[in-house]
Amino acid sequence: MAKQVGIIPLVGTIDGVNFYMRKGKAVARKAGGGFTGKAIKNSTNMERVRENNSEFGHCSRVKKLFKDSLFPFLGKQRNEELQGRLMQLFISIKNADLVSKRGQRQVGLGLQHADGKSLLTGFCFTSFNLPTENGFYDAATTTYTFTEFAPKSLKFVTGATHLELQLGVVVLDLEAMKATLFSSDAVRVLKNGAPQAISLTTAIPNDASGYKIAVLHYRYLQDVNGAFYGFQEQKGFGLMVVGV
């Protein structure tokens, strides 16, 4: 790319050279190097672009399916940073598919490998990352257990009186492109409560087919005359993948 020199900047193509404005400056470059829809679809030089587009589209659809299924926990999160992190997450999981050839790699096949599962496990949707050193997930019973949960160890947001805990399991069927969320009963613990063991169990129908992704939902609550109000800001609630 070269800069134009002259009193009047040119725009257009002359003798195989493209003249155009870029960031307020008149520049010129050899014509024919740009991308066109026809070239992307048919040119052998664009094969890698086609492969990337195919896999990117697949990951984007899976990301939307997964995120939409978590609406009861996430609500209407207009968060571009989260969207970007989720997209990068599913691209990385797709890369764990070592069976399919490039351009046909899939998130589902990536989740069949330990590397793919480890990428998803521990993913936190908000800046509120709940300590889980004393917690573990049992996939066989779809139960998450805290051997000792100590509310006093947490830094409660101003006005909060309780913390609510709930386990969700997303059944992600990538063949039917369907995702269903099943949830446990919620457990509320008092801000100054004593350490206690907590178990959260989610019932899932026997015929549910797909990858079972367990998420721990937690949020601060304020008790106002017996009515509980949740905090929706980023530091007021959280959602974390705890098992696949």
Show the residue positions of the predicted features:
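Long, polar/Ser/Thr-enriched low-complexity segments
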Residues: M1-S127
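Charged linear interaction tracts used for macromolecular binding and regulation
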Residues: I91-M240
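C-terminal tail/extension regions appended to the core domain(s) of diverse proteins
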Residues: I7-V11, T44, E51-N52, H58, ...
